[in-house]
Amino acid sequence: MERQGVDVPHVKCKDQEPQPLGESKEHPRWEENCEEEAGGGPASASCQLTVLEGKSGLYFSSLDSSIDILQKRAQELIENINKSRQKDHALMTNFRNSLKTKVSDLTEKLEERIYQIYNDHNKIIQEKLQEFTQKMAKISHLETELKQVCHSVETVYKDLCLQPEQSLRLRWGPDHSRGKSPPRPGNSQPPDVFVSSVAETTSQATASEVQTNRDGEC
């Protein structure tokens, strides 16, 4: 395989600096011999070929050293890039983990707060429902008592309506039952007025009793 010409990049080589081709100390004798044998024909051509081979060897050796240096620098750059990527990846991983931890903690605190609010509201609702149940029970009890009072008032009213008829029958005898109306005294109170006054008194007593029960509840 023949080596093709390669453009040499302008790189400063610290390890090895190529010597100028004109200052080589290995081939001055070859050059002198070539100058002496310049008129010799084939001998001079072989001498020039030898000089060219020596110069090309020096050139390619310096080129190989430059390529090696470039490869080393490229490898160092790649390693530095990989290290930077690893550091960035570790940093992002730590940031993600810390963010997850903070978000989970915040979520737990928020959830606990919401549950606490729910519990407080449930307690308030239970207390209100219990108070409402107690009030409804008291209302039912008062309703029952009111019905009993109304029944008692109705019974008293019926008794008061029947008492004048019985007293008239006892006072006037059987003639009253035959249709004869006895004379009424002037100062006697009509039965209806008497019954109405009794009913008003009873209703006032019932109202005062209900008000007393309400005051006791409050």
Curated annotation (Swiss-Prot):
- InterPro entries to which the protein is assigned, alphabetical: Syce2 (IPR034609)
Any one Gene Ontology BP term: cell division
Q: Where is this protein primarily located? A: nucleus
Transmembrane stretches, by residue range?
A: none
Coiled-coil region list: 61-87
Biased-composition ranges for Basic and acidic residues? 1-32
**Gene Ontology CC:** central element; chromosome; nucleoplasm
The record lists its disulfide bonds as none
Q: Which residues lie in Polar residues bias regions?
A: 198-211
- Entry's localization field: Nucleus; Chromosome
Q: Quaternary form?
A: Homodimer. Found in a complex with SYCP1 and SYCE1. Interacts with SYCP1, SYCE1 and SYCE3. Interacts with TEX12.
Q: What does this protein do?
A: Major component of the transverse central element of synaptonemal complexes (SCS), formed between homologous chromosomes during meiotic prophase. Requires SYCP1 in order to be incorporated into the central element. May have a role in the synaptonemal complex assembly, stabilization and recombination.
Q: Could you identify this protein by its name?
A: Synaptonemal complex central element protein 2
Q: Which gene encodes it?
A: SYCE2
